[in-house]
Amino acid sequence: TKGELRQAILWQDLQPLLNQLGPGPLRVLDAGGGEGQTAVKVAEMGHHVTLCDLSAEMVARARQAAADKGVIDNMHFVQCAAQDIAQHLESPVDLILFHAVLEWVAEPQEMLRTLWSVLRPGGALSLMFYNANGLLMHNMVVGNFDYVQLGMPKKKKRTLSPDYPRSPQQVYGWLEEQGWRITGKTGVRVF
């Protein structure tokens, strides 16, 4: 499935990053962590993970997934917007997981500043976002030329398509302005 492919590619990059950050246990923040699939796997490696999500249902699912895997003691759960996580952390974290969230945030630069503020010096950010260029390419390949010419307006109010697909160059610029150093990039999928 697409989700399995995304996870496989993610872990191809994430595992070396975890190794590079140290033997652990690391303090990890999964900001907007949803059902906790990645957070639970990181906790299984012995790291201490704080997962935050705006949805009470997602936090409950993540908590259950952690309990099912026997890692609930390695995890802390916070129901809040990722923008508000700073007030819930006792100290800076070593690694931030921020996957499939930036494209839903109306003020992405402020969000990135918040994440920067909770990261320890020398820490890392794993960022995955919905690439607007991939959306464009997909629509061109399937022949949606009129839709592309209209600027690809969002068709429905309630869809799984994000509100703010991001241009990679714009995101890279925001990161560099904030002081982040980009050490790697991987395309996950187009279709």
Regions found by a protein language model. Give the residues of each.
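Short alpha-helix
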Residues: 162-179, 185
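Conserved class I S-adenosyl-L-methionine
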Residues: 24-32, 124-151
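Class I SAM-dependent methyltransferase SAM/SAH-binding core
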Residues: 37, 41-84
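Conserved alpha-helix/loop element of class I SAM-dependent methyltransferases that forms part
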Residues: 4-24
